[in-house]
Amino acid sequence: LQSLRCMPGLHVYRPADAVETAECWALALQDEGPSLLALSRQNLKPVRTEAVAENLCGRGAYRLRNAGAERKVILLATGSEVEIALGVAEKLET
């Protein structure tokens, strides 16, 4: 996957759930060049449950959760690892 991200002109999308998959698909249809959607075969839980008019995947990255206390780490994830990162964030706050 990393080598594909280095290819000039190739847009690589790695959505975390069905909502992001739909958003990435819409972005891929708008792109002039080639696009790749790296999908998981896992049954992933939705990571975004609130309706938003903006295509957040178009930003490239966005925040899913704010820290409830002073931040000591920043968790970054894509694709199926987003669910894992959200679980880690929850455990770190307890």
Question: What is the predicted function of each stretch?
Answer:
Residues 1-30:
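Conserved thiamine diphosphate
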